[in-house]
């Protein structure tokens, strides 16, 4: 008698069950979602996000479907907002409802279970951390206290450029990153840091991983996926390296504190955080642990370098493309400084430089798609139901190119901000490169001061020309952790105002 053989495939069964799971989720979606393009089975609209410049693609879709859209990215239900008006509705009027962040593997592993202020879940710990940032870490007084470090490091950068100013093209981004990493390391963990170079290399490796849109984050129910793609192993390896560096830094500082009788060790961010840790008591509602300190310090270094370097590189690019604006900027800083060394305190006198920075943030925001928020509860907006757990993504790049907000939005025109009340504090939703509402970046003042000092110093001391054979500067973008130049900016510096010792 023949025995019937049953052909059984575990992968096929897995795919079938997963398909049913996704189908049930789609059937349970509210019927009055915002409009959007058709969704494919399982992947939804992922194929429309898989482009070199997703912020451009999303703007094109918004032109067709409107300033509020619903897209499906794998398992993630996403609401895309492309207007200043609706950004204010969500981030302002419904700020509490969208105060959370999606839980991501990169933030969980690399930032000690999302213990930094950017990705920490909304709650008592996050509120306490925001207060620490506002009062202790990045208050205006704290930023002013960093001015000596910034001035010293900018002087070192300018001298390096001046010593190499022999007609050879310079990769401007690298010089700015050297300045920013040095400044952020000194303000965060002190001037003497064993392992600082390794920390910098680790930060670069992590930013490279987080630059891409991770498919693993869009299918959270597929727990095995990060192991298949190798992401979990890669993050684990980097996390182990990072933790060893930061543990050594903290141990070294605590040892110094034990033998110190003064408070010099509390003048940088690490010193302040360790002081807060020592003040923990049984009555303290939220305690600062070593892992929290490591997450905060590393997040500050990572966030404070990449975006500022990208912004100033775009500033120089636009000024080279627009020689009239370059002349105005250089004339201003050279007339104000009159041959003297430029310092952090001097940037407040440079109105046109600030206008250039604002215009660059409008046209080339470091985060064209603001970090996603996650809805903590269902909300009603414009007659649509926004489901709980939906991601809210503001396409700020589209807001910056909105012809209803900006006259001739494709034109680089810093003068549009002359005598304008619009600033980047989060109150004017047409200009929110640092976000808005409860989750606005707490480092606005520090980042803006660094950008202004960098740009003013570079165009004050040097004239810049294109390398031989380059007739026109390209402005192609590369989307990743931020929006940077696809081809790094190479310029030849010519010393005009020599750097003084």
Curated annotation (Swiss-Prot):
It is a single-pass type II membrane protein. Its EC number is 1.14.19.81. Pfam families: p450. GO terms for biological process: alkaloid biosynthetic process. Heme binds at residue 441. Keywords: Endoplasmic reticulum, Heme, Iron, Membrane, Metal-binding, Monooxygenase, Oxidoreductase, Signal-anchor, Transmembrane, Transmembrane helix. Pathway: Alkaloid biosynthesis; ajmaline biosynthesis. One of its GO terms (molecular function) is oxidoreductase activity, acting on paired donors, with incorporation or reduction of molecular oxygen. Belongs to the cytochrome P450 family. Monooxygenase involved in the biosynthesis of ajmaline-type monoterpenoid indole alkaloids (MIAs) natural products, important plant-derived pharmaceuticals used in the therapy of heart disorders. Converts by cyclization the strictosidine-derived geissoschizine to the sarpagan alkaloid polyneuridine aldehyde, precursor of vomilenine, an intermediate chemical in the biosynthesis of ajmaline. Converts by aromatization the tetrahydro-beta-carboline alkaloids tetrahydroalstonine and ajmalicine to the corresponding beta-carboline alkaloids alstonine and serpentine, respectively. This is Sarpagan bridge enzyme. It comes from Gelsemium sempervirens. The lineage of its organism: Eukaryota, Viridiplantae, Streptophyta, Embryophyta, Tracheophyta. The gene is SBE.
